[in-house]
């Protein structure tokens, strides 16, 4: 199964040069270098808690700011997930998880439906986490959703520390993605939709 559920995406623009390699049936092994340390840390969470093998290399115009690289990594990773899922046969499709980190608690609910949508409710009081602009968290997920074709709801239940809130968000996201993309043995090779298809619109 793993040989069919992996993909590679290469994306080069005038602003960034990005490669992503993913195996959905992995062991949480990751090699990640985006030039944005906090984003690297969050992407490691996706790999580690989602048990996705993930290799990401990004070169971008971070001498200007992190926006282009952050967004383009979200685009490439979303495309990689969509490509690895293929027709989405046999997957559980839906995923949800509550992740705590100290005082923070975040809920993520998602549907690998082929219908991109993001509802995002994180209240991040700090403008930056280290050197990372906290506005870029939402921008990452917008890019991911639009290119993976998932419906994603992110809800902050409680929390005050921006780092804790964002990390809890990525941990919940990774576990929800793991749940949604895992193979449901009772479905065999059927597509989990009454329409008989799931497509990225």
UniProtKB/Swiss-Prot annotation:
Pfam families given for it? IGPD
State the UniProt keywords alphabetically: Amino-acid biosynthesis, Cytoplasm, Histidine biosynthesis, Lyase
Q: Which domain of life is it from?
A: Bacteria
Query: Where is this chain's protein located in or outside the cell?
Result: Cytoplasm
* Protein's UniProt keywords contain Cytoplasm: yes
Q: Which reaction does it catalyse?
A: D-erythro-1-(imidazol-4-yl)glycerol 3-phosphate = 3-(imidazol-4-yl)-2-oxopropyl phosphate + H2O
Q: What GO CC terms are in its UniProt record?
A: cytoplasm
The GO molecular function terms of this record are: imidazoleglycerol-phosphate dehydratase activity
- Report the transmembrane regions from the record: none
Q: What is its main location?
A: cytoplasm
Record keywords: Nucleotide-binding included? no
List the pathway annotation. Amino-acid biosynthesis; L-histidine biosynthesis; L-histidine from 5-phospho-alpha-D-ribose 1-diphosphate: step 6/9
In terms of HAMAP family, this protein maps to: HisB
Q: What is this protein called?
A: Imidazoleglycerol-phosphate dehydratase
Q: In the UniProt record, what gene is named as encoding this protein?
A: hisB
């Amino acid at each position: 199964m793993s040989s069919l559920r992996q993909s590679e995406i290469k994306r080069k623009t005038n602003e960034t040069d990005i490669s992503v390699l993913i195996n959905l049936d992995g062991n949480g092994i990751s090699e990640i270098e985006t030039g944005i340390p906090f984003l690297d840390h969050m992407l490691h969470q996706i790999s580690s808690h989602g048990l996705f093998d993930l290799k990401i290399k990004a070169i971008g115009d971070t001498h200007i700011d992190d926006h282009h690289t952050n967004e383009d990594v979200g685009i490439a990773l979303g495309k990689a997930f969509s490509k690895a899922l293929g027709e989405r046969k046999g997957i559980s499709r839906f995923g949800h998880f509550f992740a705590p980190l100290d005082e923070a608690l975040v809920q993520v609910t998602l549907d690998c439906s082929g219908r991109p949508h993001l509802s995002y409710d994180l209240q991040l009081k700090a403008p930056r986490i280290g050197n990372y602009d906290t506005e870029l968290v939402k921008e990452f997920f917008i890019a991911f959703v639009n290119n993976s074709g998932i419906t994603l709801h992110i809800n902050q239940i409680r929390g005050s520390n921006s780092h804790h809130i964002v990390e809890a968000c990525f941990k919940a996201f990774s576990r929800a993605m793991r749940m949604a993309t895992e193979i449901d043995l009772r479905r065999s090779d059927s597509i989990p939709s009454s329409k008989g298809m799931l497509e990225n619109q």
